[in-house]
Amino acid sequence: MKLIVISDVHLKPGMFERASELMDEEKLDGAVCLMDLPDDWGHGKDFGLYIETYDAASRFAAAYPETKWCWGNHDLSYKWGLDQSGYSSAMQGTVRGLQGRMADLLPAGNPIRYAQRIGSVIFSHDGLSDLYVREAAPSIKGNDVDGVLDRVNSRGARYLWNDESPIWLRPQPQYHPTKLFHEKAMLQVVGHTPVDGIWRQGYLISCDVFSTYPDGTPIDTQEFLVLDTVTWDFDGVQ
């Protein structure tokens, strides 16, 4: 299966428009969004931009109903009412309403989750570590990947709002090198941490390349990860 990954949107509705074009241009089979739809530098009260971003995400969800969606920390700060850098209290009620509207568009059985699996690839906002799995699902055998993910996806803020969870981990070697869940058998794809171009190290692909500096200047390459979930071959496409 060849798919596109939309990572760390942060109020850039045009990402969904371009991803939709690439679905046709690249003849892709599906899409995954690692979310972080809200929040960007200096836009904490830009009501129109929040609406525009969620409208674009909702249109994409309606056009491609099999898309997999993964909660990011910025999404969950509104869902759970937890403050963090970039969070806008002025937009709390608006974002919660937009999240609910978008959730209603998704097919039954395909809700937004913390971690998603397609074949031998696990997608999450920021990585699923072996340590977190051993704490979250000690009675589930590691080769029962779906059982582990079901357990992780059933958890709430108490177990997710910490640095070891799949929304905060930063498993890149320069930040928090760690053993990933089911290494060698599973590839993991993450966003959250801005990187200088899409890259793979071991069994991890990092693809948050749309982040910007406070003045709006792009930090990274602003390209989409296109991944073959069978061969693990990948490319970046603008």
Language-model-derived ranges and their functions:
Residues 6, 11-99:
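Core catalytic region of metal-dependent phosphoesterases/phosphodiesterases
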Residues 172-235:
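Conserved beta-sheet core of the metallophosphoesterase superfamily
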Residues 24-27, 62-63, 117, 179-184, ...:
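Flexible, charged surface loops at secondary-structure boundaries
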Residues 90-108, 112-180:
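Active-site-proximal loop/helix segment associated with metal-binding centers of metalloenzymes
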Residues 10-17, 39-42, 74-81, 116, ...:
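Active-site environment of divalent metal-dependent phosphoester hydrolases
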Residues 1-4, 116-123, 201-203:
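Beta-strand-turn-beta hairpins that frame and shape the catalytic cleft
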Residues 5-6, 71, 123-124, 190, ...:
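Short hydrophobic beta-strand that contains or immediately precedes a catalytic carboxylate
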Residues 1-3, 65-68, 186-187:
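Short active-site oxyanion
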